[in-house]
């Protein structure tokens, strides 16, 4: 049986985590071809999903050390240090895994630099698929890494058509390898199970929030929440009944909380 490995080391429960889980479930359950889907658990970041993976016959590849609970999760610098620790502890285990198991496909969601570098160095007998989420900043290092690895990547997927167009215009990847694939954020079966409320009751609940502005997303620099908070603080000077509700998590959470306290 051919195998598909998922690589998505995560620190917080952001949208990419849900997308990774639902994508793995879909491939395991609905694929026309018989594939064994496995998720790489680098340091214990996927431990809490073990029952879900077992339910859908998704395998878990365990690396030796479990240190996820000790890693700092919030703050830009702290989260970068945590990712660096994961890279250092995963370099040789991931190399050995790819060399020994030779999966048919290797899908990368987060912390993609490590598998990309390994593939550039050793050219494994595996089709590497790069999943690009959000609108990543194309700094010099990232652009160089992507450009140099383009020939070694099997496919590159983008969650939005805007991102796909932007990357095509940058001439970083082979255009024939790129395509649009939406994030698997919603598991339809779970969604149906959770909708147990009466339609009228639901509408009443929504109407009670008509003074709210809602912002949902990962709390990162790319989303520019400081600008939203600053502008809204000016807006409520004349509209005091209005409330901004931000739902999300990420490395900028602490900084945003400090800014909100300052503006209040």
Q: Where do the language-model regions lie?
A:
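A conserved, positively charged/aromatic
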Residues: 78, 82, 98, 128-158, ...
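Glycosyltransferase donor-sugar binding loop
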Residues: 39-47, 185, 216-222, 243-256
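Nucleotide-activated donor-binding/catalytic signature segment of Leloir-type glycosyltransferases, i.e.
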Residues: 57-59, 257-264
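N-terminal strand-loop element at the rim of the active site
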Residues: 6-14, 18, 26-81, 168-171, ...
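Short His-centered aromatic/hydrophobic patch
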Residues: 86-90, 107-114, 132
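A conserved mid-protein helix/loop that constitutes part of the nucleotide-sugar donor-binding site
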Residues: 14-25, 211, 215-234, 251-257
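Donor nucleotide-sugar binding/catalytic pocket of nucleotide-sugar-dependent glycosyltransferases
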Residues: 61, 151-196
